Amino acid sequence: MNECKLSEINWTKAAVFAGGDRGHYRTDFDCFVGVDRGSLWILEEELALALAVGDFDSVTVEERQLIQERAQHFVQAQPEKDDTDLELALLTIFEKNPQAQVTIFGALGGRIDHMLANVFLPSNPKLAPYMRQIEIEDGQNLISYCPEGTNQLKPRSDYNYLAFMPVRDSQLTIIGAKYELTEANFFFKKVYASNEYIDLSLIHI
């Protein structure tokens, strides 16, 4: 294992590779973190594996040994634990840099229970304070999180559509999108889908 101190790694902009769909990823990050089989994905793409976290039940003994040898830091998690491997990876990153910006790849698709656990990461009270710093990305979707209260969303030129999913039964307002939602026309849905950006203007929710 090419071990270094976790404090020596630049955690400012981190990519986390989970063990799901491998169809999409980017490399414009300061460091790469593998979660279980996602660690092998990083090595196969010839990227530097800063941190490998997991119980590694989805890899062979030989693959686990390779991950341990190549990772700068290796964390073997117990199979029985309160937090998922992905949650443990995120908590490690935010422990080292509370301002880190994290993009997660390979978190969608596959087992529905795993995917839903990933989508609702900020429901973990230990991760909730960092929700604005977490994004989940695949080739078609970008999931970001907003805390309760007033928030601004900056449009991205590579996405045309957006949707909103309030976690609680709150009265959501949407200002600046094609289909606005205000007190005057409010109706409750669990998912407000198929909205659109307008001229890359800020959206207020």
Task: Give short role names for the model-derived ranges.
Residues I203-I205:
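Conserved small/polar residues in nucleotide/adenosyl-binding loops
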